[in-house]
Design a protein with these regions (language model features):
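An N-terminal assembly and electron-transfer interface module characteristic of large anaerobic redox
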Residues: 1-126
Length: 126
């Protein structure tokens, strides 16, 4: 099992690079573009269900609406951090808002060190 991160395709390369660095917890990075594939929503949900912690950088694209209920259900058993440019999407998080804010800062500041810290932070969530 691992931390699962679903993010915009523009972030995937940097996230995957940070996840492959020595000393990182097990991380699966998924591009939100997979949601556009015929079975993408179900494959994404299946991977998210295997997470020990879930980080979602949600867009306002209507495809995400199909994931919302699944994210809520996953949040009943594992920590879910959902961030977005739309503050309403943060309500999908199952963690305190301060936890989501910290994770969002790591992503926003970017760079290998901050993204590595994001993964370690997510991996340490209870």
């Amino acid at each position: 099992m691992s931390v699962v991160c679903v993010a915009w395709s523009s972030h995937v390369g940097a996230l995957m690079s940070a996840a492959s660095r020595p000393g990182m917890p097990s991380v699966r990075v998924l591009s939100s573009r997979m949601l556009e594939e015929p079975d993408g929503v179900e494959r994404c949900l299946e991977t998210m269900r295997s997470a020990t912690a879930l980080f979602v950088f949600r867009t306002t694209d209507a495809l995400w609406d199909q994931l919302d209920e699944g994210i809520r259900l996953i949040g009943k058993t594992v920590p879910v951090v959902c961030v977005s440019y739309d503050p309403a999407a943060w309500a999908l998080s199952s963690v305190p808002v301060e936890t989501a804010q910290t994770a969002y800062r790591y992503l926003t500041y970017g760079g290998a060190e901050n993204l590595g810290n994001l993964f370690r932070f997510l991996d340490a969530l209870p």
